[in-house]
Amino acid sequence: LLTEATPPKKTLGGETMQTLAVQPSLVQRVCDAIVTAIVEGRLPSGGRLIQDEIARTLGVSRQPVQQALLLLRNQGLVKEASGRGLIVAPLEPKAVRDLFELRGAMEALAVRLACERPQALRQADAWLQRGRAALRDGAIEDQIAADIEFHSELALASGNDLLAGTMAPHWPKFRRIMAEVLRAGEQASRRIWDEHEAILAAVRAGDADRAETLTRQHLAKAAKLVEGRLDAEVEATMNENALA
């Protein structure tokens, strides 16, 4: 259960009022819990999001759930569905492609800049080790967390604060997308960590061209894999409907 603190009362215009905001940390924890449920498939694509059920499951009031769902809607993970309220937004091939194109451009610049300050990559090896350990354990969510931390460290090592800040809002979407990549099988997962290691070696060698090329290839392969899985799901659904 997530613990919820009672918001303090404040005065406005001489009158005591209950503050509207709940603890930001609680809202973020509710967000994280919902995203994790989406990533793990417990909240399926297109499934309804019922606030009372989520609040009851997490042991919080509806207020932080409402705020969390609003944030997730703004991030594109949740959407309004006519007559159904809020649902888990389906993954669309074009949206996946757009995200990977944006990420490819940003990370290509990040690794080029990081080649000038490889000493800033203090935790990269630790994230590689954690990712490989999670792979051995079959822990997809832990692999995703290590993947995000690894790529975030590359962005931070660039020394460009705008790069890291621009990428941060998109990580919840990529958690979901990465789950699709990692569910493709152990071979795909192992390849991801081998590619991470090669990118890191290129950055530490100061080889900006190779680091950029490897990064773009790494992301392009992941995008192609996810798009292929989504296209296959669409085709399967169409075939089922045709037979119905």
Model-derived segments and spans:
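Short linear motifs at protein or domain termini
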Residues: L1-Q119, E227-A244
